[in-house]
Amino acid sequence: MPALRTRVAVAVAVATLMAAPTGVASAVPTTAAAPTDGWQQKSFTYAMHKPWNLDLSERYRYDSGTKTHTMWVYSTDEPLEEGSSTDPRTEMRWNQEYTSGKHMWDADVYIPSGTNGADFMQILRVKHPSGTPATDIMLRVSSESDGTVKRYTDQVIKSGVYNKWWNLKVAHDADAGKIQVYADDRLVLTVADRGSATRHFKNGVYHHGSGRAEARFRNIHYWVK
């Protein structure tokens, strides 16, 4: 009899497990969608902008081993064009221009401490209606809180960025007039663009502060949707 009771107990236990509600499976956490899900990666080309009177090698370096682009500039440097009143810069000017569709800039970014008052990524409105802004968004780093990135000088994107690699994605839906910014794949900002225009991406250092400004970029990608 004890053996029979054991067999019955086992059978009941198995039946109970088989009858367990399937809803229990929903407790298993699901992986959140990545910002690039549904997007298609495209190749891109670019031209380099730098102080007009200097050789590119004096303000730009590419490490083929780590595939890292390093750009720097000093507040005392000359502008892009001789006689211009704009601030000094060393930047990658993307050649891919667009007026519609969805476009995303994606890269790992490293900003050394001491870089203060430099824009390191922007969407430039290269052709825009008279009286409208020249950019849809500019991301600037300041020295506060060990390196703080803001949209222009207001909304905070990320703090504590000095001397470390982190990922930045800027997605622009030109048809809907919407820009979304992701820091380490977390959506941190959604804002409207500034109306119809022909645009392109830029990254590097466009320096409005004092001293030296530097930014490094690797794993740079261009996505469309």
Protein language model features and the residues they cover:
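Short, aromatic/His-centered strand-loop micro-motif at the edge of beta-sheets
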Residues: 39-41, 145-169
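Solvent-exposed residues in well-ordered beta-strands and their adjoining turns
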Residues: 110-112, 171-173, 223
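Secretory/extracellular carbohydrate-interaction modules
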Residues: 61-144
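Extracellular glycan-recognition surfaces and repeat-rich motifs
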Residues: 45-71
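Short strand-turn-strand beta-turns centered on an Asx-Gly dipeptide
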Residues: 182-186
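Secretory targeting and sorting signals
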Residues: 1-29
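Short tryptophan-centered beta-strand motifs in secreted/extracellular beta-sheet-rich domains
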Residues: 107, 164-173, 179-181
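Ligand-recognition surfaces built from glycine- and aromatic
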Residues: 33-41, 98-106, 116-118, 160, ...
